[in-house]
Structures are given as C-alpha cells and as structure tokens.
C-alpha cells in the first residue's frame, strides 16, 4: 500500500507573518526532530509565533519555536522545548536564501508547520517587512474584495 504524501495536516500557523511581511517566495523544508518532539506535534502542540529562521554558512536553523515536552515521556527521554532545530533544504535553496537575506530588509520567516504524510515540514517564506501604510493598503484591498463578494451574492 502506497503512503499518502499529498495530504497535509496543519499543526501551527504564523498568522502575524503574512500581516507583518510581504512574502516574496515560499520554500518547504524538512526539520530535524527528536521522537518526543514528533509525539508532541502529533498531539497538536506547537507555537511558531515568536520563531525566526537563521541562515548560516551551510545550513538553516529554526530558532524560537516552542514544542512543549511530551507529557507521557519520562524526564530522560524528553527534549528542550525551545531548542534551535536544523532545517533540511537543498544546497541551492540555502545558497539562494543566504544571498537574498544579505539584501536590506529581507528576512526568512516560518509560515506554517505541518505533517505531509508522516513527515513534519516547515513552510518558510522569504519576506520583506511591511510599513504601516502597506498594512493599511492590504487591509483595505481585503475589505473591498469582501464587499464585492457580498454585492455579487445579493445580486444573483
């Protein structure tokens, strides 16, 4: 029986990222985890709200993400909840990220943590910070689209 790797089940989303940043490009990265971390994620416990991605010479790390200790694991088998976790990306993706991050105003933010089949993946975005007027414009455009949908719904 083939594994179903197309289905994705979301664990945690970083909703502020799309509000505070303009996402230029998205990447899907694997993440190096311990067993108790995976068990905790299967229970739906994780937070990437305060997390960010550091791009080093030859690898990328997720820093600041919190995966709470797994309650059923003993004290010796558990993990540190907010340790840095290595991201699994192709060498050319890491090179691309490293080059782009050196540009002014460009950063890498985690967008979503999810299960794809039995694997844990992290969707990261190459992002540029929004100014206050950009946030207002985005909000106005979203409101306009909502109003148009409402008007079209009443008409037909």
Language-model-detected regions and their locations in the chain:
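Beta-rich strand-turn-strand
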Residues: 88-125, 129-131
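C-terminal end-helix/capping segment
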Residues: 82, 89-95, 128-156
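Short, surface-exposed linear motifs at loops/turns and structural transition points
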Residues: 2-5, 11-12, 60, 155-156
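Helix-adjacent hinge/juxtasegments
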Residues: 54-97
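Switch/connector loops and helix/strand junctions flanking conserved nucleotide-binding motifs
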Residues: 70-72, 121, 132-134
